[in-house]
């Protein structure tokens, strides 16, 4: 996270949610000699969203991955010091992710962006269900205080679709089993 200058990270510890991380972890365990996992680490890096990457950011991320590999001893280090975590870094277990679902279908007006910090009950979006009618707008509030991790790219949504993800200060209000995108 420090090498990539991440604002947030989801922490996962081998469980049974069948997440991508677990699939990678199982491969590592299968290849470990005698079950010795000392010095081993599994991580997945999601390099931004579809709308967020430009050449400068891609280069910064590539350099960050290279620095991570240097730190793990995979690539020979250079003279630069290892980076530290950001002062505002958010690292929480995956169970702290609140998936905010759309209660209705319609057009989305976001009031927050990824990287914003929100308070419980704060309006994070509105869904327009019936344009021009006062009752045709549904306000969406944050279920708890936390960090906006992602939000939907498309501005149209169906009832029940993922609207945004918030890494909460506490475990998710709507606790769920399985991978985030089930």
Predicted regions and their residues:
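Structured catalytic-domain cores with a bias toward divalent-metal coordination
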Residues: 1-182
């Amino acid at each position: 996270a420090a090498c990539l200058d991440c604002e947030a990270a989801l922490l996962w510890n081998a469980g049974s949610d069948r997440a991508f991380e677990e699939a990678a972890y199982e491969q590592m365990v299968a290849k470990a000699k005698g079950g010795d996992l000392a010095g081993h680490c599994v991580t997945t890096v999601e390099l931004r969203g579809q709308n967020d990457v430009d050449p400068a950011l891609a280069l910064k991320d590539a350099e960050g991955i290279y620095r991570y590999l240097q730190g793990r001893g995979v690539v020979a280090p250079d003279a630069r010091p290892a980076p530290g975590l950001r002062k505002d870094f958010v690292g929480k277990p995956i169970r702290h992710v609140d998936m905010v679902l759309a209660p209705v279908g319609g057009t989305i007006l976001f009031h927050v962006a990824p990287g914003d910090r929100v308070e419980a009950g704060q309006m994070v979006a509105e869904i327009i269900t019936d344009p021009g009618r006062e009752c045709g707008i549904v306000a969406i509030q944050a279920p708890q205080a936390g960090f906006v991790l992602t939000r939907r790219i498309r501005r149209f949504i169906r009832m029940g679709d993922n609207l945004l993800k918030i890494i909460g200060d506490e475990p998710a209000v709507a606790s769920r089993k399985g991978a985030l995108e089930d």
